[in-house]
């Protein structure tokens, strides 16, 4: 969408698609959200500025958290697009052991019956998800509704457990762990001052 004579793009898949054209034309791309790992590595470009985060950072922190909590059998689940792939790779980098299983879903998927059946059969002690927005809302409701939260601890990034998701899901969010950089109700001096 045009904003004061500029174009605004969002999403890792979009950043990777339009980036080369913009870079070839020596046009700066300022990303307020997407930070595909490719643009921080092999495809790093002086015309790309990520003002938020690199995609895999939150997920790497979650992997480290899962290691510290000593989860022994962890399954991971994310949509099959660049940010989802970065999520799983970041988690695996932070987690000290190999993951039990990796599942990539369709981007925008809302029905997780097949994935829940697979999880029930695998019986992991923890599940890491990257399912932002409606995907996360539906998955968490279905996960808890299927009774899987009684035996499997769910862990996710802030994108899968932000205020909007919590508001939409409600009580089934209780007990979920998430990694995020900030929330308005963090009880520490820096957050309260902000």
Where do the language-model regions lie?
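Short low-complexity, flexible loop/linker segments enriched in glycine and/or proline
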Residues: 21-23, 44-47, 116-117, 171
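Extracellular/periplasmic periplasmic-binding protein-like sensory domains
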Residues: 142-194
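Hydrophobic/aromatic residues located in beta-strands of well-ordered beta-sheets
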Residues: 29, 74, 99, 153-155
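Residue-level signal for pocket-adjacent positions within structured domains
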Residues: 34, 43-46, 99, 177, ...
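Ligand-binding clamshell of periplasmic/extracellular solute-binding protein-like
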Residues: 6-17, 32-39, 129-137, 156-164
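Generic beta-sheet signal
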Residues: 30-32, 51, 157, 179
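Extracellular/periplasmic Venus flytrap/periplasmic-binding protein
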Residues: 1, 37-38, 46-146, 185-192
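Extracytoplasmic "Venus flytrap"/periplasmic binding protein-like
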Residues: 1-8, 12-31, 41-43, 122, ...
């Amino acid at each position: 969408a045009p904003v004061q004579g500029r174009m605004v793009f969002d999403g890792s898949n979009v950043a990777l698609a339009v980036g080369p054209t913009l870079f070839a034309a020596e046009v700066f791309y300022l990303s307020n959200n997407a930070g595909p790992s490719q643009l921080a590595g092999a495809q790093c470009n002086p015309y790309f500025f990520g003002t938020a985060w690199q995609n895999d950072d939150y997920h790497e922190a979650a992997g480290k958290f899962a290691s510290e909590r000593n989860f022994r059998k962890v399954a991971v689940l994310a949509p099959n697009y660049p940010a989802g792939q970065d999520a799983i790779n970041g988690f695996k980098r932070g987690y000290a052991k190999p993951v039990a299983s990796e599942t990539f879903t369709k981007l925008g998927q809302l029905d997780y019956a097949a994935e829940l059946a697979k999880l029930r059969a695998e019986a992991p002690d923890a599940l890491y998800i990257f399912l932002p927005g409606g995907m996360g809302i539906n998955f968490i409701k279905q996960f808890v509704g299927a009774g899987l939260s009684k035996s499997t601890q769910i862990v996710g990034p802030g994108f899968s457990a932000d205020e909007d998701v919590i508001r939409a899901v409600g009580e089934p969010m209780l007990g979920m762990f998430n990694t995020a950089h900030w929330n308005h109700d963090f009880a520490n001096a820096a957050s309260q001052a902000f």
